[in-house]
Regions:
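Conserved, charged catalytic cores of large soluble enzymes
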Residues: 227-322, 407-421, 433-437, 442-550, ...
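Often metal-dependent polyanion-binding catalytic scaffolds in large enzymes
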Residues: 1-305
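Secondary-structure transition/capping motifs at alpha-helix termini
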Residues: 60-63, 115, 162-167, 200-206, ...
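Conserved small/polar residues in nucleotide/adenosyl-binding loops
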Residues: 747-753
Length: 757
């Protein structure tokens, strides 16, 4: 009996969709309400309990009980006890399920020694429960007897989805999907049921992730082809003929809707359409394709009309707009992207070929120490984030809390109040409407506000001095680490009184920093604070453990090994700390990124296929260089910097996949050797490809004076770092020269993500 009641109650709760609105007077505070079995919510009515108990008495004592005053009194007494129980339990009102009320009636009947009446009441409830159960089974049988609309196509989609995938069963997908369908179900619900049924099987068999992706692809085809006035019921086997038409129709529609660059229509769409490879749709995992659907595909009023291979061709066409042989290069780029051998950065995938082709990943800015500059930097953040750029802000120049303000003769509130505004700006201005805005604030370790800065991501404290949506990073000079190791004191300064520290590195920084310490002791510097270096380091590490912030970045290593140190100073890294570029009032540094998928570059013996890797990197470097010329620049300082220095960043992904394939533990010496070998190979081919491109396009404008022009490779610049560090700190010496030009100032990096399509 208890099991039956529990089942009924569970079913009722599942069906609890309040289909009828409740009158306002029934929503007053203190009201008791009842959830009926059909899900409807009504006011608690004690008279209904009186009727039910009276019927139970009549069943035992016959109709004479109806005229008995003692029975009426007993019914009234029992009903009030039931009501009082719930009033005491919920004095402020609340909602009770009908089963709970009936349980309480049973209990009160038993307590009052009316056992015969209680027994009759229980039997009545069981009889009603059995009737409801039979009615439910009958309704289910009726549904099963009627065939589902389009069942033949459902079976065909499932069969196509599982083709060639070991361990998958199309019948199982269809069976699970049919459990959630009904006669007359809309097309969208049928497709969604198929996706959910297949997705639920992924944990049992990983290959279902590919099957689910193919089912999702069928749903996408229906949506896109219908919008493009093509055969919306097409299956994957039909796409060889349909993809060229879809490309042409997509370009035409996109230009009409003012979403795509009209220059795309000037290319030979027929030639490009013939090169599309529909079979590469089957390379997607479910998560990869769903991510593209949610964020990347071009849409009109939330209707996606861009198919996966059209998407890759659109990106490739956008990157080839300035090429002499546009179609040939677009095809070359398409083959690389659609194979997943190489993947462009998210902004490039978002915006290539569109009217605002903002293709760069991250922007680095330095914030000046005045209100116009501070709020100007925030405006730049908003404009850059609008077109999907990530942001890295250097806040070290802004004076610390308590520092004197000459203009107002007041005291500064420091950087933290401004960072709160930056945090909220990043939330308010998302990245092209496709993902949240993202920013990282950098502060050098000697800044007077560093201790408060470390606590910005804490969940406790004054929320006006917290930035829950913004990343933070600590820009650490080597001298601080020396003080930590030697257990010495560390002095914090306000940058308005230690003006040049932020622009100095290595031995020059150390010399000037110690001079400022002497000036502070003499009383010539007002805003400063001495702290224990080790204690500050402990706080940094504690906050990193507690909040994941601040990230640790090292100023001297970044600057002393920079190929571009002749043109300025690196004041910070970017949003994801993977690239370090010069910034100033006239230059907002720009990251132009992409990554090679190492997993796709293994030979039959599972070793790196270096010949294929060389070809991939050669094409990738060209694509990245094209980004610089095609890119839409929301602010002029970014354009100035990007054209002057032309930095690109080629990273890798798939390293963990290789370790799995080769059965190498991540923490082993073998893994370290593989990492060293793979990155050395990528580095060499990236520099070689850059040099080859320079022969065609010439070197970048600030090339002369760079470490490249001096024949110093990035790996060789470690000797420069050695000169500025304590004796014996590093013991490495390499002899190697480079006599090539290069069209870009930076070529490769460590990417911040392992996400993959």
């Amino acid at each position: 009996m208890e099991e039956t009641k529990a089942t009924e109650q569970t079913e009722s709760i599942k069906e609890a969709k309040i289909s009828e609105s409740i009158p306002l007077d029934e929503l007053k505070p203190g009201q008791l309400r009842i959830i009926k079995r059909n899900g409807k919510v009504v006011l608690f009515d004690v008279s209904k309990i009186e009727v039910a108990i009276t019927k139970a008495f009549l069943a035992v004592y016959s109709s004479t009980a109806a005229a008995s005053s003692s029975v009426h009194q007993k019914v009234d007494e029992l009903s009030k006890k039931v009501e009082t129980t719930f009033r005491n339990r919920m004095p402020s009102g609340g909602t009770i399920h009908i089963e709970e009320v009936q349980d309480q009636v049973e209990l009160e009947l038993m307590r009052s020694d009316e056992r015969k009446v209680a027994r009759e009441y229980i039997l009545y409830r069981e009889a009603r429960a059995q009737v409801r159960k039979e009615e439910l089974l009958d309704s289910q049988e009726e549904v099963k007897e009627e065939p589902l609309k389009g069942v033949a196509r459902i079976n065909k989609v499932a069969t196509e989805a599982c083709e060639g995938l070991d361990g998958t069963n199309p019948d199982q997908i269809v069976t699970e999907a049919e459990k959630n369908l009904y006669e007359g179900a809309p097309e969208e619900e049928i497709k969604q049921a198929m996706i959910l049924a297949s997705r639920a099987l992924v944990e049992k068999e990983p290959n279902y992730t590919f099957a689910t992706a193919r089912i999702l692809l069928d749903s996408l085809r229906y949506e896109a082809l219908n919008f493009l006035d093509l055969d919306k019921d097409a299956l994957q086997e039909d796409m060889k003929d349909l993809y060229p038409k879809a490309l042409s129709s997509f370009i035409t529609k996109g230009i009409e809707l003012k979403l795509l660059n009209p220059k795309l229509a000037e290319m030979d769409l027929e030639k490009l359409g013939k090169e599309i490879m529909p079979e590469r749709d089957n390379l997607f995992t479910y998560l990869g394709l769903q991510t593209l659907y949610d964020r990347y595909f071009i849409h009109s009023d939330e209707v996606r009309f861009e198919l996966p291979q059209v998407f890759f061709m659109r990106v490739s066409m956008g990157l080839a707009l300035n090429e002499e042989n546009k179609e040939e290069k677009a095809i070359e780029f398409y083959k690389l992207l659609s194979s997943f051998d190489y993947m462009s950065s998210t902004p490039t995938l978002f915006n290539s070929g569109t009217l605002h082709s903002q293709l760069s990943s991250c922007y680095l800015t330095t914030v000046p120490d005045d209100l116009y500059g501070i709020y100007g930097a925030m405006r730049d953040n908003a404009m850059l984030s609008k077109w999907a750029g990530g942001l890295g802000n250097d806040w070290t120049p802004v004076r610390g809390m308590g520092a004197h303000i000459k203009g107002t003769n007041g005291r500064s509130q420091g950087v933290v109040p401004f960072l709160k505004v930056v945090n909220d700006t990043a939330v308010a201005v998302n990245q092209g409407g496709k993902r949240k805005g993202a920013v990282c604030a950098y502060l050098e370790t000697w800044h007077l506000d560093i201790e408060e800065f470390l606590e910005l991501r804490k969940n406790t404290g004054d929320d006006r001095r917290r930035t829950h949506d913004m990343n933070t990073a600590n820009w650490i000079p080597d001298l601080f680490m020396e003080r930590v190791m030697n257990k010495e004191t560390w002095t914090l300064f306000s940058p308005n009184e230690a003006k040049d520290l932020h622009d100095l590195t290595g031995n020059e920084f150390k010399e000037q920093y110690e001079k400022y310490e002497e000036e502070a002791k003499k009383g010539n510097i007002k805003a400063y604070k001495e702290v224990d270096a080790e204690e500050l380091w402990r706080k940094i590490i504690s906050m990193l453990f507690e909040t994941g912030h601040p990230w640790l970045t090292f100023k001297d290593a970044c600057n002393l090994r920079s190929p571009q140190q002749h043109t300025g100073v690196i004041h910070s890294s970017n949003l994801c700390t993977e690239i370090t570029l010069n910034t100033s009032q006239d230059e907002i540094a720009v990251c132009n990124l992409g990554s090679v998928n190492l997993k796709n570059h293994l030979d039959k013996d599972n070793n790196l296929d270096k010949e294929k890797l060389q070809k991939t990197i050669s094409t990738a470097i060209r694509m990245l260089d094209n980004v610089i010329d095609i890119n839409y620049y929301a602010v002029p300082q970014a354009e100035n910097s990007n054209f002057k220095h032309r930095p690109i960043g080629l990273g890798i992904m798939g390293f963990q996949d290789i370790l799995q394939i080769k059965k190498i533990p991540y923490s082993s010496d073998e893994a370290v050797e593989l990492a060293d070998d793979s990155m050395e190979t990528v580095s060499y081919f990236a520099i070689e490809a850059s040099s080859d491109l320079a022969k065609e396009r010439g070197s970048y404008s600030s090339y002369e004076g760079s470490l490249w022009s001096q024949g110093i490779f990035p790996i060789d610049s470690i000797s420069i770092l050695k000169e500025h560090r304590t004796e014996g700190f590093l013991d490495q010496n390499e002899e190697k020269k480079m006599d090539w030009d290069t069209p870009v100032s930076y070529t490769h990096l460590t990417l911040p993500t392992i996400s993959r399509v």
